[in-house]
Amino acid sequence: MRMKQTIPSSYVGLKINEWYTHIRQFHVAEAERVKLEVEREIEDMEEDQDLLLYYSLMEFRHRVMLDYIKPFGEDTSQLEFSELLEDIEGNQYKLTGLLEYYFNFFRGMYEFKQKMFVSAMMYYKRAEKNLALVSDDIEKAEFAFKMAEIFYNLKQTYVSMSYAVQALETYQMYETYTVRRIQCEFVIAGNYDDMQYPERALPHLELALDLAKKEGNPRLISSALYNLGNCYEKMGELQKAAEYFGKSVSICKSEKFDNLPHSIYSLTQVLYKQKNDAEAQKKYREGLEIARQYSDELFVELFQFLHALYGKNIDTESVSHTFQFLEEHMLYPYIEELAHDAAQFYIENGQPEKALSFYEKMVHAQKQIQRGDCLYEI
């Protein structure tokens, strides 16, 4: 009887690299196929603890991809994330070089998904220490894109723009990375909005929407529509903004995307600013319920803020509670935005002394944003 031949770990390593290529391209079916092949081959592989750690890290990255692609509530992703993290962190002392890079980079993605931006940046910065070990251009572009994304959310606008352009230049050379190209266009447009140049953001978003439609990707189409709504709001065209937000909400609802609370929140915010109180109240109730269903603590707070500020009777206690929550989580970009909206509200209602306190809060948040590098030193 012939003994079963042992598979070299180097061969399985190449297969994991192929798996990672499909993950980065968001090719779910191919990624799932190669994942199964890897799992079968590992059973007959020569002993290699580093390779097994690499497999565990890639399984975690696979879950991050699925969490982005799959509609909310279709799986037990949070439980699986916890189990994978526990397994990987139990072997963290063994991680060196490229494995250490992947651990910190993938963990940063996970923290970002949880809206733990400061924690995400900490892991990205740790990954950066081993970036010199990365030789693949696409992997370098992946890192640049993730840095652009996190710096955008922390309102480090010019740094974010630099990373986004760097990533986009690489992705444009590869036809199979259209999803990332679209996402780079989103970040570039968002940075133009933050620079108060929404008219420069518009062509990037129109291109992104066109590419998303050609890809037939509902998530990216809904994101492009949402970002166009945000852009028109910045331009003061509230009716157009409401229309685009509404289209985004429709897709998010039908696909059960996890960014549905965000889309409804922005639509509700615009409706309140249009003085369309009846429709705004309806969307507020709907959005709050959905945010609770999705266990989205941030947007539960933000919906309650809208109701507290724009409802029939101003609830100053709830307004204060929201700012306290945002400060505890160091979400200064949200503080800046909400403080500005509250100040504008009080100015319009002839209460300049109350507006002043919110302008002061806005300026304080801007200072914290400008000092952002200090938040994630390691």
Swiss-Prot record:
Pfam families tied to this protein: RapH_N (PF18801), TPR_12 (PF13424)
Reported impact of P261L: Sporulation-defective phenotype. Retains phosphatase activity, but is insensitive to PhrA inhibition
Origin: domain of life: Bacteria
Subcellular location per the Swiss-Prot or TrEMBL entry: Cytoplasm
Gene3D superfamilies named in the record: Tetratricopeptide repeat domain
Function: Involved in the regulation of sporulation. Acts as a phosphatase that specifically dephosphorylates the sporulation initiation phosphotransferase Spo0F and inhibits its activity.
InterPro entries for the chain: Bac_ResReg_Asp_Phosphatase, TPR-like_helical_dom_sf, TPR_rpt
Enzymatic class: hydrolase
Annotated control of activity: Phosphatase activity is inhibited by the phosphatase regulator PhrA. Interaction with PhrA dissociates the RapA-Spo0F complex. Activity is abolished in the presence of EDTA.
Domains as described in the record: The N-terminal half of RapA contains the necessary structural determinants for substrate binding and enzymatic activity, and the C-terminal half contains the binding site for PhrA peptide. The central TPR3 to TPR5 repeats provide the binding specificity toward the Phr peptide inhibitor.
UniProt-recorded name of the protein: Response regulator aspartate phosphatase A
Reported pH dependence: Optimum pH is 7.0.
A single BP term in Gene Ontology: sporulation resulting in formation of a cellular spore
